[in-house]
């Protein structure tokens, strides 16, 4: 999808006007360019919409593309160049690592960022506060806790008529102090449902778009975590990641007919997050094995360093939030700022030297990237295949033809 609009296109979440049941599918707000495709009305009862003809939308978008000044992107390893900006889709881009990455890419002038976020207003304010220029980003509603929302997000991204050159699966939930599991709209334990299953469906659906892109270096990046990698010190802090025989995942993780944990054990919020990150890293490798040779897409994962001040830790106990940043800064030396972590992820998105597929990237203290080793479980091809097949069934892709 060639970049066609010089101005920011924003999408409002379906929750503004739709009832809870069928909200994502039926909302008139999703997938229509505001100001062109919608007339908004307010009343004492809330916000209503009227759809108008979209033919003028396409005309104006095409006219905008015609006068836009193309930007030459860096040469690929083969020496090719493309006379357009790259388009990167980033989930969880309204804060933390996602926002920092979106900013780092947008600042180059060579990337347009599609920000997949649950809260439109939060994302809009965050982009403005970060100094991102209008026209460098598009906000599209995405709730990874709903598979319907994921599918609607994919449909709305396609309506933008931009290419999909890079997909970054970044968003995550972390509930380390939870005593009881919470669940997604589809009945999955929240951490695995959002961090793994939501992203699994998103990546599978957008793979065709990545494949059809003419960008010199197409990439799918899934953010990993050192906490799910048990060959590291951090990965051995209890509770350790362990997917076991996948009996919980095979049974649906609903906490009723099956355990809410992948290994079938008792619920533990911290372990659920770590297990989801193992699934992320296994999924990246399975994507590489199945599709890299056929599509030319680079599949990679990374751990950008410990962002000890990130909002990901907002549900931790106050004492942890107080002591964790200085501990990482002065004891482990693993601390990185959100800004630096964003630059590292942006490097994996765009650096011509980081095109190797199937790699888990990390950084030394001197900010030099290197290929890191994954734990035995996180690099087990048989377990990756099993996680893939079970995940297909859970998200409704078991009979899906690629």
UniProtKB/Swiss-Prot annotation:
It holds the Pfam family adh_short. Coiled coil: none annotated. One of its GO terms (biological process) is photosynthesis. GO terms for cellular component: chloroplast. GO terms for molecular function: protochlorophyllide reductase activity. Keywords: Chlorophyll biosynthesis, Chloroplast, NADP, Oxidoreductase, Photosynthesis, Plastid, Transit peptide. It is found in: Plastid, Chloroplast. Pathway: Porphyrin-containing compound metabolism; chlorophyll biosynthesis. Its EC number is 1.3.1.33. It comes from the Eukaryota. It catalyses: chlorophyllide a + NADP(+) = protochlorophyllide a + NADPH + H(+). It is an enzyme of class 1 (oxidoreductase). The keyword Plastid applies. Its main location: plastid. Phototransformation of protochlorophyllide (Pchlide) to chlorophyllide (Chlide). Belongs to the short-chain dehydrogenases/reductases (SDR) family. POR subfamily. PANTHER family: PROTOCHLOROPHYLLIDE REDUCTASE C, CHLOROPLASTIC. This is Protochlorophyllide reductase B, chloroplastic. It comes from Oryza sativa subsp. japonica. The lineage of its organism: Eukaryota, Viridiplantae, Streptophyta, Embryophyta, Tracheophyta. The gene is PORB.
């Amino acid at each position: 999808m060639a970049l066609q609009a010089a101005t920011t296109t924003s999408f409002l979440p379906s929750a503004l006007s739709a009832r809870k049941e069928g909200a994502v599918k039926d909302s008139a707000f999703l997938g229509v360019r505001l100001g062109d495709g919608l007339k908004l009305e307010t009343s004492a009862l809330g916000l209503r919409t009227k759809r108008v003809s979209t033919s003028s939308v396409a005309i104006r978008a095409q006219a905008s593309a015609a006068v836009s000044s193309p930007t030459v992107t860096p040469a690929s390893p083969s020496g090719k160049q493309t006379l357009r900006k790259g388009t990167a889709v980033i989930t969880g881009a309204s804060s933390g690592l996602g926002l920092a990455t979106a900013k780092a890419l947008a600042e180059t002038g060579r990337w347009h960022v599609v920000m997949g976020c649950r809260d439109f207003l939060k994302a809009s304010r965050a982009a403005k506060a970060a100094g991102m220029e209008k026209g460098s980003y598009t906000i599209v509603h995405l709730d990874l806790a709903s598979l319907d929302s994921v599918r609607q997000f994919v449909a709305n991204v396609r309506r933008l008529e931009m290419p999909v050159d890079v997909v970054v699966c970044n968003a995550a939930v972390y509930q380390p102090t939870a005593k009881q599991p919470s669940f997604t709209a589809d009945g999955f334990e929240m951490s695995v449902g959002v961090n793994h299953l939501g992203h699994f469906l998103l990546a599978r659906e957008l793979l065709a778009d990545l494949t059809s892109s003419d960008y010199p270096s197409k990439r799918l990046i899934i953010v990993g975590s050192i906490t799910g990698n048990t060959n590291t010190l951090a990965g051995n802090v209890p509770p350790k990641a362990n997917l076991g025989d996948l009996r919980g995942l095979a049974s649906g993780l609903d906490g009723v007919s099956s355990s809410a944990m992948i290994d079938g054990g008792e619920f533990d919020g911290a372990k659920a997050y770590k297990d989801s990150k193992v699934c992320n890293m296994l999924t990246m490798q399975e994507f590489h094995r199945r599709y890299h040779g056929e599509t030319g897409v680079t599949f990679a994962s990374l751990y950008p360093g410990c962002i000890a001040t990130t909002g990901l830790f907002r549900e931790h106990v106050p004492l942890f939030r107080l002591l964790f940043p200085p501990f990482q800064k002065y004891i482990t030396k693993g601390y990185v700022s959100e800004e630096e972590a964003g630059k590292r992820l942006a490097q994996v998105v765009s650096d011509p030297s980081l095109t190797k597929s199937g790699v888990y990237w990390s950084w030394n203290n001197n900010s030099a990237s290197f290929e890191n080793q994954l734990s035995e479980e996180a690099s087990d091809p048989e377990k990756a295949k099993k996680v893939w097949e079970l995940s297909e069934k859970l998200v409704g892709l078991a009979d899906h033809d690629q």
